Amino acid sequence: MANITAAMVKELREKTGAGMMDCKGALNETQGDIEAAVDWLRKKGLAKAAKKAGRVAAEGLVAVESAGHHAAVVEVNSETDFVARNDAFQAFAREAAKIALNTDGTLEGLQTAHFPGATETVSEKLQALIATIGENMNLRRVTKLEVKKGVIASYVHNQISEGLGKIGVLVALESEGDVDALSALGRQIAMHIAATNPVALDASGVDAATVERESNILREKNAGKPDHVLAKIIESGLKSYYKEVTLLEQPFVHDGSKTVSQVLKEAGSKVGGPVTLTGFVRYALGDGIEKEEGPDFATEVAQQAGRA
């Protein structure tokens, strides 16, 4: 039997919202496999459909920079929140986002770009900052969005300084309508994305493995039903899943009576032209990164005193 730890139970509870004993039982049944335990709980009706989410444990900042028809978002990690509040670290994150506007939007392109006012590349500048501050840091990821006509709207949640925070969102709206009205609409949608964390724009963007996983869960939960009935249950279940996790089908957080798709359709008459949402990106600090938990306070003190 697998060794089931309290940390494993805690992680499963955070992912599913299921009770402690249910989580422990699921882990025992699946030999400690977290993802298999999620499915086991869902098949038993003990957990809701879970979006893809990793444990958020890294520190640092998400930085957003917009310039007309293009915008960029970057994530820079540090070991501690203390360093994330350092002026030099914040200046680096902000400048990295600005530099990303003039790159190809890839991480390598940003790392090798020239850092303004210095002889180094962005990567070399970060290494110099690490040497100065004395803590490991990482330029983790970057995304750039562009539109031909319209706006790239942005929103930063838990903002600690202009364009810097814990969650950064970009929304690309293609339209020939009024720019100010588009920007206001885009910001509302960006706030919606920050709150709901959709996995794709529409059903076509949900990866095949996820669709197969959802189908299998529905199939096992309804085992024994006639094939024609089961097919309808799976079809209905997937529609419900798409409404939960795809942006255009989600109920709009600012008006739950409408979907985001409906809001965009109605916006055309207000902004002076059809509006198409062509893309979005949501960065949550440390998304998917696991960090080792340190010793408790008493153990840490004992270690420092040489007694452990």
UniProtKB/Swiss-Prot annotation:
Keyword Protein biosynthesis listed: yes
Top-level taxon in the UniProt lineage: Bacteria
Gene3D superfamilies in alphabetical order: 1.10.286.20, DNA helicase RuvA subunit, C-terminal domain, Elongation factor Ts, dimerisation domain
Subcellular localization(s) per the UniProt record: Cytoplasm
InterPro entries: EF-Ts_dimer_sf, Transl_elong_EFTs/EF1B, Transl_elong_EFTs/EF1B_dimer, Transl_elong_Ts_CS, UBA-like_sf
Molecular functions per Gene Ontology: translation elongation factor activity
Cellular component terms (Gene Ontology): cytoplasm
Keyword Cytoplasm found: yes
Record-linked PROSITE patterns: EF_TS_2
SUPFAM superfamilies listed in its UniProt record: Elongation factor Ts (EF-Ts), dimerisation domain (SSF54713), UBA-like (SSF46934)
Region feature Involved in Mg(2+) ion dislocation from EF-Tu, mapped onto this chain: 80-83
Pfam families, per the entry: EF_TS
Key words of the record: Cytoplasm, Elongation factor, Protein biosynthesis
Classification via NCBIfam families: tsf
Family to which this protein belongs: Belongs to the EF-Ts family.
Protein function: Associates with the EF-Tu.GDP complex and induces the exchange of GDP to GTP. It remains bound to the aminoacyl-tRNA.EF-Tu.GTP complex up to the GTP hydrolysis stage on the ribosome.
Protein name: Elongation factor Ts
Gene symbol of the encoding locus: tsf
